[in-house]
């Protein structure tokens, strides 16, 4: 099997901490595996504007789910060896996977597909997915802090709440609760929560989940959410591709989410094609692209696996950190 190494100029010897695999090489890793999802599953998991199909699942996500299952099994073996060494019987904690990437890059679809596929592997029937949207400050609080135009930037999140949530899950808490976010009202839903009860695997999906810890007020380094990840994935693509995907999704939302009377963006439902494109590109240039360049893209090198997409949303390259 042919495997090439990604070269970097950061190291004098030209070595890289990543192994680079092209689509063809990666797909061969699942040649003998049975496809666990059917067309109905894929239709249900597909995101708006994301042309996920059976071929993509078989060639990309099937080998990825197998790789993740190997990591989960290895963590179980390490837990058993550690408890034997310590002479103490401690309960195994959930395996936590982080999925990061830009708005509109398709990370939510990838997270949903991985959840469904990992549920079908032996040993991990209970797989939960949490998005960091639930840890955005409520709209009223964002307005009070003058952060509405910075929604999605690191400062718009309750980072302490997110860190506490992941820490408690990783610590083995029987039940952990998170706020519920509505993409229709664009706000936290009062009185509604996401409840996670000791899953085998927890997938945490969001823009900034790979961000490093910020220095504390006392000058000491704090903890980052990614400190609790057992595996992390960054979904990558050219910025120009992501912009087009964002604009395309915005157009389609006019007849779906935006069309609902209770939608925060209901005013956009009647925009013409030209006005919709102009509005979407304005939002992209003003908010999403700066956030990508300043906060999201710089975390790419912190991931254990980088999935690079082509203009048609298909994964064309994988960079896997060497063990």
Curated annotation (Swiss-Prot):
EC code: 2.7.1.33
Enzyme class: transferase
Naturally occurring in which organism (per UniProt): Paenarthrobacter aurescens (strain TC1)
Protein name: Pantothenate kinase
Cellular localization per UniProt: Cytoplasm
A matching Pfam family: PRK
Reaction it catalyzes: (R)-pantothenate + ATP = (R)-4'-phosphopantothenate + ADP + H(+)
UniProt keyword Lyase present: no
A GO biological-process term: coenzyme A biosynthetic process
Pathway(s) per entry: Cofactor biosynthesis; coenzyme A biosynthesis; CoA from (R)-pantothenate: step 1/5
Keyword terms: ATP-binding, Coenzyme A biosynthesis, Cytoplasm, Kinase, Nucleotide-binding, Transferase
Top-level taxonomic group: Bacteria
Family, as annotated: Belongs to the prokaryotic pantothenate kinase family.
Gene Ontology annotations for the cellular component aspect, listed alphabetically: cytoplasm
GO terms for MF: ATP binding; pantothenate kinase activity
Chain sites annotated for binding ATP: 101-108
């Amino acid at each position: 099997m042919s495997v090439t190494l990604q070269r970097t100029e950061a190291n004098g010897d030209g070595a890289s901490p990543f192994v680079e695999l092209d689509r063809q090489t990666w797909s061969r890793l699942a040649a003998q595996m049975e496809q666990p999802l059917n067309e109905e599953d894929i239709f249900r998991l597909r995101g708006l504007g994301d042309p996920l199909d059976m071929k993509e699942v078989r060639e990309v996500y099937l080998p990825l789910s197998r790789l993740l299952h190997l990591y989960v099994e290895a963590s179980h073996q390490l837990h058993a060896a550690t408890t034997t060494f310590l002479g103490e019987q401690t309960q195994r904690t959930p395996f936590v996977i982080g999925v990061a990437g830009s708005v509109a890059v398709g990370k939510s679809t990838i997270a949903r597909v991985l959840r469904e596929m990992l549920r079908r592997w032996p040993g991990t029937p209970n797989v939960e997915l949490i998005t960091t949207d639930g840890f955005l400050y409520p709209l009223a609080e964002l307005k009070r802090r003058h952060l509405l135009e910075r929604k999605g930037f690191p400062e718009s999140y309750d980072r302490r709440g997110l860190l506490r949530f992941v820490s408690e899950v990783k610590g083995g808490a029987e039940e952990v609760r998170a706020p519920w976010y509505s993409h229709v009202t664009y706000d936290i839903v009062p009185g509604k929560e996401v409840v996670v009860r000791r899953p085998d695997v927890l997938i945490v999906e969001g823009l900034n989940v790979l961000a490093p810890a910020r220095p504390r007020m006392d000058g000491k380094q704090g903890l980052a959410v990614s400190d609790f990840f057992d595996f992390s994935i960054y979904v990558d693509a050219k910025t120009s591709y992501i912009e087009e995907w964002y604009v395309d999704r915005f157009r389609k939302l006019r007849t779906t989410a935006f069309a609902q009377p209770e939608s925060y963006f209901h005013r956009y439902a009647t925009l013409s094609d030209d006005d919709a494109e102009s509005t979407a590109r304005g939002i992209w240039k003003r908010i999403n692209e700066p956030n990508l360049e300043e906060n999201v893209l710089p975390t790419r090198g912190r991931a254990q696996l980088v999935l690079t997409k082509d203009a048609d949303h298909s994964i064309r390259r994988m960079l896997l950190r060497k063990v």
